[in-house]
C-alpha cells in the first residue's frame, strides 16, 4: 500500500485534488446555491471521515489529514484550476481528465487492488455529495436527494474510472 511519502510533492497535490474534482463534478451536474453549500460541506466530510476499502486506508488517511489542515483554500482548491472561460461541458471534461490523472499517478506506484479501492472511494465521495441536498421541489417540499443529472454524473465518474 502506498502513502504520501511514495509520491513527489507535485504528484501528491494532484492526488489531493482528485476527490475534490470528483465532488465538483457532481456539484456542476445540477448546480443550485443552497444545494452547493450542503454538497461542498458533504464533500469535505466524506474526505475527512472516510471509511475506504482496506487497500487504500493509509493513502486516504494521508489525504484526509492534509485536507483537514487546509484553511480557506478548501473551497477554491480545485475550483480555481477549472478554466474560468469554459462552458459547462468543457469544464466537465476538464474535471474528468483531472480525475483520470490523479488515478493514473496512483496506478504508477500502487498495486491494482489499491487503485481499485481508490476508485471506489472516489465514487463514494461523489455519492456523498450527490446525496447531500434535495434537488427540485419548492421551499423544501418535494424534490429528491439525488437528481437525474447527479445520477448521470455518478455514472459518468464510474465509467471514467472503469467501474
Regions found by a protein language model. Give the residues of each.
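Small-residue-enriched hydrophobic alpha-helices in membranes
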Residues: 1-163
